[in-house]
Amino acid sequence: MTIRAAIIGASGYVGGELARLLLFHPDVELAQVTSERLAGKPFTSTHPNLRGHTALQYVPMSKVEPCDLLFLALPHGEAASRIEQFAALAPRIVDCS
């Protein structure tokens, strides 16, 4: 069974490392990555080490679709105020912020 995952706040170092691990995991499909500032731009514009491994583009948080597993890589303290919103998107959430 493939796990569909998304990363909220994927433009920083933590988001990039999460993406690298998930992209090479045989049981995970990295479905979406978010950045408000970079929405519409290629994910690899900020993580050139992953060129050739993904064609994902950044989407704003408002466009994130439900998934199986949601990773939060937001600046410290930002996730807590929006946990209800995130809980509606995935049954499992990992907060790395």
What are these regions (language model features)?
Residues 1-97:
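N-terminal Rossmann-like NAD(P) cofactor-binding subdomain of oxidoreductases
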